[in-house]
Amino acid sequence: KTLYCELDLVEGETEKAEILGRDLKIIRRKEIPALRKELGIIFQDFQLLHDRTVRKNFEFVLKATGWKNKKDRDKRIEEVLNEVGMIDKIDKMPHELSGGEQQRVAIARAILNNPKIIIADEPTGNLDPETASNIVSLLKDITKQGTAVVMTTHNIPMLDKFPGKIGR
């Protein structure tokens, strides 16, 4: 359902809705965890778990997607937080972070499982221009690693800084 909304699909009006080789109209419940591993989602309002630290937010995602080994989880959490410059916030609660910091944490969460595609809903919508520019640079770097980024935005000038195909 979330993907239908994000991709502006209306049930009944779309013959086929395929992502990463899976038709969303007929996907089986047991196939969804595998799809989630291949997708990263960045929500406009971050969707961090407010009762958990950054580390615990990430542990929750990794456990839910099948990461059994604690050492592997800890290593991956540190890797992605270093990548977005947020390792010093690992034990902070979401309410202790600024909007830009929460967005970088949300991006780190989206790349935890090395997804093939990231869907970003207004990733710069609630941010000041400088922080927004930093977020766009970060997403641009992620695309250089082979991950596709599908982004919705009202910030048209920002799109000029982003590589790839742009639908307006």
Question: Whereabouts are the PLM-identified features?
Answer:
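Conserved ABC transporter NBD signature motif
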Residues: 15-23
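Conserved catalytic motifs of ABC-family nucleotide-binding domains
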Residues: 114
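Helix N-cap at the start of a conserved alpha-helix in ABC-type nucleotide-binding domains
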Residues: 129-131
